[in-house]
Amino acid sequence: MSRERLINIGFGNYVLAGRVVGIVSPASSPMKRLREDARAQGRLIDATQGRKTRSILVTDSNHVILSSIQPETISQRFAQEEGI
């Protein structure tokens, strides 16, 4: 049985590492549209605890997860889990 790795995305929130396909900055217009489309379709998960959104994670199930942790920090956590 394979063990799924959990990655901390801030404030006690975790995501399965194998399900994440992208970590992006929320500042661009396409990412703002992605967030609004996900909200309208019920695919948005807000893990910011009311703080500013600093990164957007996209999963293989097309869910969009908002995090208040910088994309670089989250990618470092992925790299640590991978042993890179």
Swiss-Prot record:
A Pfam family the protein falls into: RemA-like
Superkingdom of origin: Bacteria
HAMAP family: RemA
Stated family: Belongs to the RemA family.
NCBIfam families assigned: PRK04323.1 (NF003315)
Protein name per UniProt: Putative regulatory protein Ddes_1405
